[in-house]
């Protein structure tokens, strides 16, 4: 016996299932396998599922059909009594193996133990199938191997069961009635030999063949198991007196014989094991001993193959001897000599009790510990830690809706449900006219047969400006899409989603999924007069696509149509995206707005609709459904993300699935079986017991077929008669359609929202669908099955420690079934500590003044209604969990009462008038670092104590301080330093705290400085932040400097005095007194220094002149002679430090300049800065002169007290300053006030970081939603044309001519594809498309660059004209020789190359040639890159005249040749005399670069002579054509761009303030094609044209002193240079909508442009019905005669409405007088007056901008001036959309 005192382990695998609920055990395994704490369990279950799938697939078809589809083993366990049928043995064997190994693996993972039984004395034993489970452990060294090996055990178990059943059924067929008969009995009280005698006697006397004999399969001391075919067994026991009267019982062995050596042989074993299909290596070694149930000894197997062969042999042919097993185990344990014995098993059994009794009897002194491997599965492990996205639960965190009957938000929707209201009505007049479109008899074609429906109030209400839509776009956009945007926003707002705030809110990971099943608006309302936005506003995909576009979500965007289930199907698809990892946050919902009577007619004809009213769900009189509007949106993310993001979780989605009723009797008929399949799928996915579901929201349409089938499917799965529900398991049902009707595509989302609200309100609202009695097709035993259709409001409490499970159903008329399973949100830990902030920030914003005012008022009202609201939570919600807009108010308050007062003041008219929009660009920020004069004890104490980031930063810096040999500065912060700390400690504390504060501002709060300035000691922190010094070097230098001052200077011998006077005043008063200027802080704030005695004397003199003097509380006189002794030593210290170039500019008070380079600041600089004065005022002035700082710059004082801030305010009175800390003020109070100030200035802090350290201590509040500035955009359906079309007749022959697709191969570098070609007798039409991003086209464009952008030059349009002209003319008149005169070229908008890579930028060209006029017209169009649609209006037009007689041109030019040559000779002469400028090629194009940067191949001018607006040049064309052209653009440009050089380079032009661009020319003619081998000259004289800002001239092209070409009436427009960025930029390129280029110029618009994107529709945020303006197409006649309303004010005022205050604005003669304009309106009017040359008094409200001379160019200038000078972001189209001064004043008052 070994001398070993280690613990020994016995693991026993039985052959019986535990007595627990088997399905419940498998649900536990599946549910826990989704948690990453049970990775090996998951791996085992997945591998087992795969091997079972493979084995099932190998079965014959009849057997395969018996097995349901399964993704996990759970459906197999839920088959019911799987013992029935030919696969009973296989299923029982496999499931027992899965259960035992799964419980084994899970137990060890739950205990957190690394399973390594090889280090212990471990032995394994098992009985029957348990041996196979034990084999999985015997072959393993760790849990991961158990998972792999276990799958092989499952495979063999399944095969064993299949084989045994197959063989046994050949011995005796099963009972016809399905009765299960046992193949084994246990006999007790008799010996094995006695029983064997009886069996032998029976087998012999009955003549039973050996194959069918009755035999002993197992034996022990007290019992014997007898096996055989059931009928033979029965006969044997009947014939034997011994057996008939013995104590015996049947074993649950129903599928055949094992342990039968007479039946099976070696081939049988090989068939079962089938090693060739093994999923593990057959040579894998055996690691642990496994006892044979026959011999009791360990199997003598060395490999997996040998072990499975031995087990297979024993199971098929070996007799079980329990006594041998017990003896073998005892001997094994004795061999280990253990100190204790660990026994692990699965519950208990008769066999295990015998084993245990034997062990306790054999080892009475041994501690035996029995471990059950089952209970771990029932423990609560807290929130699931999903091992992958697919195993996450999902959290619904936001919701919003527009429901019928006034359910315009979720609270109002709940009121409808809680009050049990039925909201159906007749069809409102704004949808269609019931008097003409309703016929209950059904005789009128296309008429509705029911007048009823459920409708959203005023679905046209929309805040167009908020969503950057013009009124016309809003009007044409389907209200479904509009309200999808609105509810998406409201749901996101409720969820506190700020894009980019967290990983799960990364915009690229947010997707949208919306269900929609109809197109009423597009097909009816908008189609009456199809407009620009017919496609983008009506096609379904744009509904969710617009949400992605507006919010800039690059994630997935899907529009889902599954008929009536679309809304919930969209939720399911969205959930699937989360589970698949395709998105991290999803918006999902359903949309339905009814306007089209056609759908009423169609549904009526199909007998879908009730003619009596509302949906009567489960009522006996149910006769169809009642249609309904509905819009709903929800925000869903993975549960773990929601918890990490501190979201409010409304409910949790466990699973969701969709299938189809494919087996129904018709496509619209439901199918109970398919519905049940879907239910089982969701409960299996969630591993939920269906009996635990306590509420089901029915689809419940109120149709006879639908209600009957749904009741059957629901009850069969969730309330079966067996097993029945317990008394405490009441299942309650309801259907929202009985309240709000059937919302079709929105029905599912309405049901979903109802259940979410139930979770919120803890109540099940009454089902009001039963009007008479319950439908007789519904099962009668609802009460017996514990099912109730709740007809009263019923509490639905959440019990402690439990979760309510609910299910939502939604079925589509096409057959789709969607089901979602939900449970309660996790209970939130409310014991998280929060930092003690004395003051809190609260901010509110909006996009319009009216919305802002309403938002303020709504919050104030909310505070009144919720007096217990937590101020910290409110701060967190409004700051960190809201998107912030340009109109802002903010408060730093310490109480709710203080906030109420602040809101009251902010909501006053005067206060709102002062609110200005924050600038579009973040203002520059300068950090100012204060010097030692700001020192005090307890600096930043509150931040250090409770702001973890700041504390950690300080401690890291203090660690550096101490490692450098200095004393810790922490005592300065906590106040424990004592009185009069050393200069070293005080100065280092300043530097350290300022560095920490700077990091707080930059890294945490998001303030990125554009420059830094340090005052005296503060410069060390500034240099660290600017990257010149490392943190360690900065601290080292500051500390050593302080030590040297303490060492070399005497404290108190010198002093510093702050004097409220200028340097010159002080000098004048003090004369020759001894003092030094230490600091010049402002023009009238100077610090002087010197000996104490000298300063006392100076102070007396100054104060005697009434000049205020304040001693500076410092022990030394810095920047004076007192520090001279330290300079040499400090120099040596500083020279050891490495200085780097600044990463941001440094405003230097020493140099009074701004430092950008890496050489200026060095050791010498620091020495000078120590000794020389601090010229703070001079430094600021230098930064102002450079334009680095101005009135808009935001200054952050980074120091203990805002000393620098006061200096900045004095130097720049309008400066916006913020401070970090303030002496004698709580840090949080200071921080809060200044964060709000920065926020209002447009420097939005990273609010999330301000709360992040203790975010879990804050609660996201549900606050009033954003107050929309709504207008009712509605196109009313006019007339009866949906009825009339039923009577239209078609002749079918007279249609438009068919356009024959072109087979032409016209393709050049600029013309890429013909998309349409029509050739007639005398006319021809050609439509082509070109991609500007094509390499050859792009090269031509980039040859002409403006503002670093490639801009298409007019020579490109010229070549395209010549190319198309030649092509079409040859088509109509082949072989004809003509000359082409390109003319009337007018380019309205520039074409700028999009800088994005791998994009397309298509242009359309339409050309029409008429031989009768010998003229071709051309028009160029942009293409919308998103839709591929051609723009409605062209951006360029031109023509080509075909002239056969070129002699006319020659004659014309010969008369002019001598004049042109004479002017050239004159210019040559003037150049020789110095009166004209002679420019080389290089100089000419360098001068051109002022506006245009030409590529080398465009540079054809060799020499230029220019005087004022006249010039000629010598030209040499580059030889390369560089592509396929008619005439290369770079050649055309070379011979013609002399005119552009004159305008943009001549001394006569004001090129500083303006640049010049060409909108085109009247004609371009060449007698012969340009030739690179020919030398040319060009001559032009430009002159002003009568049209304002326009110049023109004729440009002549000469060859050998003969005119051979001409650009006639070449025009140029003067454009303010400040518009360069607007016209020529990457943004302009992407929009393709700029107004001018070197080849195009702005033109006065002939049509109104859309409203500015920032302009919301003009209406009160909460309009009353009587005052609500309505936007609708003014259709009073058939659609083709519709006259559109005025775009500028569409929907804002009807003709009957008077403008408020109109009567008061009229003067005595009825003329309109100018009201006094103040604030931003007054500033804008003054600016307009300055630019237009008008008097402000002339800008009366009725004055139009056309009258004032504001054309499109001037409007661009004004919008740019508004931005630059007033900080207002307005679009130039404002002056078109607001045609009068009064209109514009109204707009400014509202939005600025």
UniProtKB/Swiss-Prot annotation:
GO terms under biological process: asperthecin biosynthetic process; fatty acid biosynthetic process; secondary metabolic process; secondary metabolite biosynthetic process
Keyword match Endoplasmic reticulum: no
Documented EC number(s): 2.3.1.-
Gene3D superfamilies: 3.30.70.3290, 3.40.47.10, ACP-like, Malonyl-Coenzyme A Acyl Carrier Protein, domain 2, Polyketide synthase dehydratase
Disruption phenotype: Fails to produce asperthecin.
Domain Ketosynthase family 3 (KS3) positions: 391-824
Biased composition (Polar residues): 1664-1684
Residue ranges of the region described as Disordered: 1634-1716
Keywords from the UniProt entry: Acyltransferase, Phosphopantetheine, Phosphoprotein, Transferase
SMART domains in UniProt: PKS_AT, PKS_KS, PKS_PP
Leader sequence segment: none
N-terminal acylcarrier protein transacylase domain (SAT) as annotated region, ranges: 1-395
Domain text: Multidomain protein; including a starter unit:ACP transacylase (SAT) that selects the starter unit; a ketosynthase (KS) that catalyzes repeated decarboxylative condensation to elongate the polyketide backbone; a malonyl-CoA:ACP transacylase (MAT) that selects and transfers the extender unit malonyl-CoA; a product template (PT) domain that controls the immediate cyclization regioselectivity of the reactive polyketide backbone; and an acyl-carrier protein (ACP) that serves as the tether of the growing and completed polyketide via its phosphopantetheinyl arm.
General function of this protein: Non-reducing polyketide synthase (NRPKS); part of the gene cluster that mediates the biosynthesis of asperthecin, an anthraquinone pigment. Catalyzes the formation of the aromatic polyketide from acetyl coenzyme A and seven malonyl coenzyme A molecules. Through its product template (PT) domain, catalyzes the cyclization of the polyketide backbone via C6-C11 aldolcondensation. Polyketide is subsequently hydrolyzed from the NRPKS by the action of the hydrolase aptB into endocrocin-9-anthrone. Endocrocin-9-anthrone is then oxidized into endocrocin by aptC.
Entry-linked PANTHER family: FATTY ACID SYNTHASE, NON-REDUCING POLYKETIDE SYNTHASE APTA-RELATED
Protein's name according to its UniProt entry: Non-reducing polyketide synthase aptA
Organism (species): Emericella nidulans (strain FGSC A4 / ATCC 38163 / CBS 112.46 / NRRL 194 / M139) (Aspergillus nidulans)
Annotated gene: aptA
